[in-house]
Amino acid sequence: AIRIIGGKASVIPEACVSCGECVKVCPAHAKKIRRDLARLKDLLSSGAKVYASIAPSFTGYFKGVKIEELTSALVRAGFAGVSETAHGAESVSAHVSRLLAQTSSPIVISSACPAAVDMIRKYLPKFAPFISPLPSPVRAHCRQLKEIYGDDSKVVFFGPCAAKKTEADTYSNELSLALIFPALERLLEEKDIKLTETLEPSMGFAEEG
């Protein structure tokens, strides 16, 4: 989804599905994932109550780090609280079960991945009607947090996938920002916060099973 204009590579918006493949394959390394760390810092210093929604895959990036340690670090970094995106996934899963029991559709395509949803809508439009009408887990989690802490609270997602940035752009009233784990790591490094102490309790995480 890249074209060359005036000797410069540019993304073709109507063809882009935010998968990040162009970042990997561009021989000139001209494409970069948008960095939103400065926007996050502004949000944290704005006086707003900012809550972090953490993808469960943090355990794969922050090796050996306990959730209590990550929670404590984010609270010290300025977040009002921390919760796991899996809470939203639990809610969506329950609704999916009911949807499958009630629908006459031969297939139901998950709405969890924004890159997959965009790909279907742009390249396989005949399957678009089969995309689940339910929100993605991160959007469901944002709604849960706002219901608890108020509509004026802000939610920032941290996860492994840059495509979530498109959800933040499209549903900014629910999700203020979406950043990948390296950005979270940079934030903690800049604030000289170590992932070694537990000062604050977790706000609650999804049950195992």
What do these predicted regions represent?
Residues 1-17, 21-37:
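Iron-sulfur cluster-binding cysteine motifs and their immediate structural context
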Residues 34-209:
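Iron-sulfur-associated redox domains of electron-transfer enzymes in respiratory
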